[in-house]
Amino acid sequence: MLMPKRVKRRKVQRGRMKGKATRGNFIAYGDFGIQATECGWITSNQIEAARIAINRYVKRGGKVWIKIFPDKPVTEKPAETRMGSGKGSPEYWVAVVKPGRVLFEISGVSETVAREAMRLASHKLPVKTKFVTRRDFEEMGGEVNEG
């Protein structure tokens, strides 16, 4: 399960997700990827499930990059507990995702294999996604870094 090694604060506020992603919104390492089209929280278990789905489909071919990291703790109070008496303890970690954020990247496989692997991964995620290629970003005029 992905989680930070150390954090400054054990509990954080929920916050709000407005606007589009300003960083991580282009393909930096691979040739293909999936990009979020809506905002949401993705838990570390969902990231791991998507990673396993990709790796199972591509088998030993290709390399996969996970471009998001769950750095936000989500607290929960125990079941059947009365209101009050402080905030609950951290239960799991989430990555805050905004529209435009590239979640996973893959290279070393054909486009059809990458498209199917990303489709399987997107079924494990709670946000809507779309398949993107490095060509898409080069056509838009943005320079794409070689990873």
UniProtKB/Swiss-Prot annotation:
CDD domains: Ribosomal_L16_L10e. GO terms for molecular function: rRNA binding; structural constituent of ribosome; tRNA binding. PROSITE patterns: RIBOSOMAL_L16_1 (PS00586), RIBOSOMAL_L16_2 (PS00701). GO terms for biological process: translation. The keyword Iron does not apply. Keywords: Ribonucleoprotein, Ribosomal protein, RNA-binding, rRNA-binding, tRNA-binding. InterPro entries: Ribosomal_uL16, Ribosomal_uL16_bact-type, Ribosomal_uL16_CS, Ribosomal_uL16_dom, Ribosomal_uL16_sf. GO terms for cellular component: cytosolic large ribosomal subunit. Gene3D superfamilies: Ribosomal protein L10e/L16 (3.90.1170.10). It comes from the Bacteria. HAMAP family: Ribosomal_uL16 (MF_01342). Binds 23S rRNA and is also seen to make contacts with the A and possibly P site tRNAs. Belongs to the universal ribosomal protein uL16 family. Part of the 50S ribosomal subunit. This is Large ribosomal subunit protein uL16. It comes from Clostridium botulinum (strain Hall / ATCC 3502 / NCTC 13319 / Type A).
